[in-house]
Amino acid sequence: MVRKCLLAVLMLLSVIVLPGCWDKRELTDLAIISAIGIDRTNDSNYVLHLQIINPGNVAGGLQGGGAGDRPPVSVYSIEGNNITEALRKASMKVSRRLYFAHTNLVVINEKLAKEEGLDFVLDNLDRDTEFRTTATFVVAHKTKAENIVKILTPIDKIPSNKVNKTLDFTEAQYGRVVKINIQDVLKTLAANTMAPVIPGYMMIGDDKKGVSMENTQATDPKAILQADGLAVFDKAGYLKYWLEDDESVGAVWLMNKIQHTFINADWGKTKDAVSLQVTHQDTKLVPKMRNGRPYIHVKVSVEGIIDAVKYPFQLSDPKVLAAIEKALNKELEKEISHTVKKIKKNKIDFIGFGDTIYRKYPEQWEKMKDTWDKEYLPELPIDVKAETYIRRTGLRNNPIKHQFKDD
């Protein structure tokens, strides 16, 4: 009898921990927002562009151009005095409850980032209990945020997925950008020892044709989206300048976020005579103090594979490989040093030079932190030293030209 009573009590108690359905949400009641674009009008109002997934049109998978002639997403543009007002006004256009739990991309207008900064936008997003701060953050470069969220893409059905995948692939293979999310930016701004840097994204082509399904069905799309440079902000969250092409890859080297990229080196009169595919790398920022003033020693260790050769090298000769390694070292040091000069010229430390000094010399940092960017950074001695090791020369030693010459 006692056992039966205990069993009954346990069964009753178990009911307490069982999940209920009081807060259930039907898919047909939700407008799943995959991306948010934020622009400003000429009269200083905000315009939100909400990229909403059409579930029935992506049921066949996430790759391909869409379900027939039906777009996989719909984009609603709402204007308001602030972001909160614009979101409330969305109820006049969208028949379902806005659902931000799956938002994986936020795009901010370049002009807005320059004139107003990030504080107000980030504050609005971070306050929403449903919004994920792991959403990727990009700046619309030379275009409106509207175009980044509206353009339909031929390979990935959901445009926000295309942006995320491109950033992943570019960061992993090309080294020209770094993928940043909202949380990364919030942490950087809160730390106040370095400034945030955010990847740029641009639209190439005809924006009017890019929003039609024809853009996904053409072999040569009339509009495409492309990762484009790094936007450098100050510690207050205002966009100050851009790093593009070699400048951006130099910054990624300094941030120690290179996964794979390539290094080209000239040989005599032959431009880009040899190309090294980087397979492993490690960048260390070593702070030192000299006569009470800081300086930074940048150590870059690189391993890679010979990827392309234009000059008839004798690659089976260790002395030739050693000479090529020196040429690659020189080129990499030049590339990084060029970026360092631009960083010092613009007086914004987004790499974290100051942070390394703070960690090793906290007492000295207290005296420098208030004037670090304006006084110390422009005069900071930064020595760059690269050490490259050629792991392999590919599937062949000598170039084909060299082989034909020997024959």
Curated annotation (Swiss-Prot):
The organism's place on the tree of life at top rank: Bacteria
Keyword list, A-Z: Cell membrane, Germination, Lipoprotein, Membrane, Palmitate, Signal
Family: Belongs to the GerABKC lipoprotein family.
Organism: Bacillus subtilis (strain 168)
The keyword Flavoprotein appears for this protein: no
Membrane topology type: Lipid-anchor
Matching Pfam families: Spore_GerAC (PF05504), Spore_GerAC_N (PF25198)
Secretion signal, residue range per the UniProt entry: 1-20
Lipidated sites in chain (N-palmitoyl cysteine): C21
Predominant cellular place of this UniProt entry's protein: membrane
Cell compartment(s), UniProt: Cell membrane
Lipid-conjugated positions (S-diacylglycerol cysteine): C21
Protein name (Swiss-Prot/TrEMBL): Spore germination protein KC
One Gene Ontology cellular component: plasma membrane
InterPro entries: Spore_GerAC-like, Spore_GerAC-like_C, Spore_GerAC_C_sf
Function: Involved in the germination response to the combination of glucose, fructose, L-asparagine, and KCl.
